[in-house]
Amino acid sequence: MRDFVEHNPWHFVEENSFIAGSFAWAGVDYLGESSPWPAKGWCSCPFDMTLKERPQAVFYHPAWKPEEDYLKLVVRDNCFDQAVGTDHWQYPPMADTWDLPYTDSRCVEVRCYTTCDSVQFFFPMWSNPQLPLKPRRTADYRDNCITIQLPARQGKVLAIGYKDGKEVMRDSLVNHGPVAGLRLEADRTTLSPVAKDYAPATAFGTVSHVRLRLIDKEGRTQQMQPRTFRVETEGPIRLLGVETGDMRRKESWRTTELKTYFGEGLVRLQSTTATGTARLLIYVEGFDKPFIQEITIKEH
């Protein structure tokens, strides 16, 4: 709130029976309200402009659905290159990665948001791994968030959540290898052609969102080694835009070339009035050949 008290506005709903609910302004980042420059819009929302959920948004999972099993590890540290947001609307920098830039074993804050009764942490990189870290009771912490300070050493942080003494969930933070490839995920690989009269009734099913992720040789997302990528299209398809979620970008919103942001990017495509097979080609820094996603356009 305005006094910089760590008290999420949702708690006012929980604590006061006469409040029916609340609205989160806003749910998704948007352009046009700098917060602050060089951000070109509002960048403190649970979802960025690619509709990727921010690590800061994990607060809402146990808050809004306490009956569901949930456990998520994130690191809170100022090493993460994130837009800061405006004053008391901003979140502290967080990311769900253990690929940190430190080599001196300094402590960082690990947060575990959970609906479990207790969580046991395993930290084999500790100087005395034979001594297990004692279980933490969720009730002893605020916001369903267990915090622990751990040295930023190479390896793995494992959290096991328990309910009524039984294991129900696990999550981990591990060090990833260098970028070895790119994974493409399209929400639609088959589209309808746009009507020749551009009738709005036929607009459904004409847009595909293709998310790209830098991966290591194990297929895990590498968030901390950004690469420049360039987009080209072939066939009956048109490029609507390229986005990464970083509101501080200096490039035009019509650019075909950006740098990944925490290992990811998003390409928006739309069919034309023609049918056939279209191809999205993504050229990534460090790779000789493009990564290709095919999109089929046909009448339905």
Label every PLM stretch briefly.
Residues 153-157, 208, 274-278:
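Exposed beta-strand face motif in extracellular beta-rich ectodomains
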Residues 169-178, 290-300:
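Short beta-strand elements
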Residues 1-199, 204, 217-221:
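Substrate-binding clefts and catalytic carboxylate motifs of secreted carbohydrate-active enzymes
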Residues 204-210:
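Short, solvent-exposed loop/turn segments enriched in Ser/Thr/Gly
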Residues 180-183, 232-248:
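Short aromatic-acidic-glycine turn motif
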Residues 161, 214, 282-284:
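Conserved structural position at the C-terminal beta-strand
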Residues 129-140, 240-257:
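Solvent-exposed serine/threonine-rich low-complexity stretches and specific carbohydrate-binding patches
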Residues 146-152, 253-273:
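Short, hydrophobic beta-strand segments
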